[in-house]
From Swiss-Prot:
Keywords: Cytoplasm, Methyltransferase, RNA-binding, rRNA processing, S-adenosyl-L-methionine, Transferase
Sequence similarity: Belongs to the class I-like SAM-binding methyltransferase superfamily. rRNA adenine N(6)-methyltransferase family. RsmA subfamily.
Main location: cytoplasm
Catalytic activity: adenosine(1518)/adenosine(1519) in 16S rRNA + 4 S-adenosyl-L-methionine = N(6)-dimethyladenosine(1518)/N(6)-dimethyladenosine(1519) in 16S rRNA + 4 S-adenosyl-L-homocysteine + 4 H(+)
Keyword rRNA processing: yes
CDD domains according to UniProt: AdoMet_MTases
One GO MF term attached to the UniProt entry: RNA binding
Described function: Specifically dimethylates two adjacent adenosines (A1518 and A1519) in the loop of a conserved hairpin near the 3'-end of 16S rRNA in the 30S particle. May play a critical role in biogenesis of 30S subunits.
Location relative to the cell: Cytoplasm
UniProt protein name: Ribosomal RNA small subunit methyltransferase A
Enzyme Commission designation: 2.1.1.182
């Protein structure tokens, strides 16, 4: 397979000079200039000519053009207006790409899927995510329960490691729980910082998140479930009791009931949030309705 291409230092620099483009640090702009990394991302995504693909932050189109070669339709969200004319040039050979100049965090993604990808058999997200908003993007998409089969996304290595972290490890936290609630997580490859222009300060990690047919644990109130998981990690070194004392309204007068709720859920009050797994948090969430005086 022949990759022509934007994803080389020479071609990227030529485009930068041609358009007088200056990187905005506030937008976390680091353009990928390595075709081998892109090839691995495409292969991990497993897309074909029946697939619809959502890309977030296409930059100059280095990944986008390869997605266009493999997918039925590509829908790219780009927040930076200055990149729109560049993308108009670099993606001009492809009639199966739509670029929307919009912030993905504010976009109506469900409506966009219905408008642009309705004729595709399956929907995938494939993207080099901006470091500074990786978590809001991922959680925003996952929590919307969109009909997305899988996500192959590149992010800061440290953040990527959190996604697959297990209990009682340093990387484990509320993000690990939330992502594993919705998906199976697989690490694909570490990407060195030198394959970007400009290079970021840290290495990256490509991960594949395959959406589960149903969430990993049965939860009656997802909003409460996520409040409890986030609340358990506000201060990692504190016990689950102390963190929830800070989370629950009028907790001092309800302390005995909080302890009772924890113990009835099979969670010792002296444990730390990092030691609990998804089933533990599901049990806490589902049992809380039996204690109506405990309000978050």
């Amino acid at each position: 397979m022949e990759y022509n291409d934007i994803a080389t230092p020479t071609r990227t620099k030529q485009l930068l000079d041609q358009y007088g483009f200056k990187f905005k640090k506030s937008l976390g702009q680091n353009f990928l200039v390595d075709t081998n990394v892109i090839r691995n991302i495409i292969e991990a995504a497993g897309i074909d000519k029946t697939s619809g693909v959502i890309e977030i932050g296409p930059g100059m189109g280095s990944l986008t053009e390869q997605l266009a070669k493999h997918a039925k339709q590509v829908l790219a969200f780009e927040i930076d207006q200055r990149l729109i004319p560049i993308l108009g040039e670099t993606l001009s050979p492809y009639d199966n790409v739509t670029v929307i100049n919009e912030d993905i965090l504010k976009a109506d993604v469900a409506s966009a899927i219905e408008t642009y990808l309705h004729h595709c058999d399956e929907i995938f997200v494939v993207a080099n995510l901006p470091y500074y908003i990786t978590t809001p993007i991922l959680m925003g998409l996952l929590e919307k329960n969109l009909n997305i089969n899988s996500y192959v996304v590149m992010m800061q290595k440290e953040v990527g490691e959190r996604l697959s972290a297990i209990p009682s490890t340093k990387a484990y936290g509320s993000l690990s729980i939330a992502v594993q609630y919705y998906t199976d997580v697989k690490r694909i490859m570490v990407v060195p910082k030198g394959v970007f222009m400009p290079p970021p300060n840290v290495d990256s990690l490509v991960v594949k998140l395959t959406t589960l047919e149903r969430p990993r644990v049965d939860v009656e109130d997802e909003n409460l479930f996520f409040k409890l998981t986030r609340g358990a990690f506000v201060q990692r070194r504190k016990t689950i009791l102390n963190n929830y004392m800070s989370l629950i309204q009028d907790s001092k007068e309800h302390k005995s009931r909080i302890i009772e709720w924890l113990e009835a859920s099979g969670v010792a009050p002296s444990r730390r949030g990092e030691s609990l797994n998804l089933n533990d948090y599901a049990q806490l969430s589902n049992n809380m309705k039996k204690y109506p005086e405990l309000v978050i």
